[in-house]
Each structure stands twice: as structure tokens, then as C-alpha cells.
């Protein structure tokens, strides 16, 4: 797969700063672009998001939009998928290899999800995560991680390391950990 393939995580009016911070960290780890559509349910403060994202805020490629119309006007002719409990297919039912370079996946706000009219307009590419009947949704940050990694798995993880890079691929087998305090 092309190393230029890119996942674009689109957050529709997120309400919880800690979820956005966790998503920032996921986007940095996966080389994904983060798009945040306002209004937000919290004050967007770099300092707080950086602390909650384990210091990765300065590393994330992100864009803020005033509203849905602003996002649409700046992102024409994109390949947009939506995730919602109302989706008829699962995230793994889609073949993301059919996409040329970029995929945009929109995740809704924690309380009410994606605007229903937006869902209706994109319903042929709206999917859900399978889950038991006892719950209606999975935490937003967890959902982003699940979906992003499914797309990247199908693309064979372009540009991502498949071995440990900070301590070395043979760190465990060479027992280097025994010398640490």
C-alpha cells in the first residue's frame, strides 16, 4: 500500500476534552489527521489537551472548523464515512483498499452522535461497531482507535513501525530490561 494513504478522523462537535486528548494521542500514533467541528462542549486549551494527551498535542496534525458548513466548504469531494449506532453494516464490512489516498471518518458527539440529516445524506457509508443490546455505544476515543486501526490494518499499516523502535526490536529477548532500575 502507498505510504501516502491517510486516515482523517473527523469529530463532530465533541463534548469531552479527555476524549479529544486521547484521540489526539491516537492520531499522532497512527499518523492520522484530526478534524474538529465546533461547537465544542469544552474550552479548547492547548495546555490542558497537551497534558491529557501525554504531551502529543504539538505533534498532531489538526484543523478546527466553525461548524459543519465550514468543514464541508473546506473539504470538497472527500470520501466520507460516518460511524453511528444507526449504521446497517459494521466497520469491517467495508473494503478501505478501494480508496485512493484518503479516507475521512466522522464520529459524533458523545451525547447525540452525528446530526441525523448528515447521517441520512451519507447513509450508504455509515457503519457501526457490533455490540451487545445492553449498550447503545462505546466510548468515543475507544471507537476512534478501533476504526482507525481497522482501516490501517487493511492498508498494511503504511508508514507505521511494526516493531518496537524506542527500546529496540530485541529488547525482551536480549533481556535488556534486567539492567533497568
Q: Where do the PLM segments sit?
A:
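Post-transcriptional modification and biogenesis factors for structured RNAs
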Residues: 1-181
Amino acid at each position: 500500500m502507498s505510504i501516502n494513504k491517510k486516515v482523517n478522523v473527523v469529530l463532530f462537535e465533541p463534548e469531552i476534552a479527555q476524549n479529544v486528548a486521547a484521540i489526539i494521542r491516537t492520531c499522532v500514533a497512527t499518523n492520522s489527521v484530526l478534524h474538529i467541528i465546533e461547537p465544542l462542549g469544552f474550552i479548547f486549551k492547548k495546555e490542558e489537551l497537551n497534558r491529557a494527551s501525554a504531551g502529543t498535542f504539538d505533534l498532531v496534525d489538526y484543523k478546527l472548523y466553525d461548524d459543519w458548513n465550514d468543514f464541508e466548504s473546506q473539504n470538497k469531494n472527500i470520501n466520507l464515512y460516518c460511524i453511528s449506532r444507526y449504521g446497517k453494516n459494521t466497520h469491517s464490512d467495508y473494503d478501505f483498499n478501494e480508496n485512493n489516498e484518503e479516507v475521512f471518518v466522522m464520529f459524533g458527539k458523545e451525547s447525540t452522535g452525528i446530526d441525523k440529516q448528515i447521517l441520512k445524506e451519507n447513509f450508504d457509508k455509515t457503519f457501526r461497531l457490533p455490540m451487545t443490546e445492553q449498550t447503545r455505544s462505546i466510548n468515543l476515543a475507544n471507537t476512534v482507535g478501533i476504526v482507525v486501526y481497522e482501516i490501517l490494518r487493511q492498508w498494511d499499516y503504511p508508514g507505521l513501525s511494526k516493531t518496537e523502535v524506542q527500546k529496540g526490536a530485541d529488547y525482551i529477548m536480549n533481556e535488556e530490561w534486567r539492567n533497568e532500575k
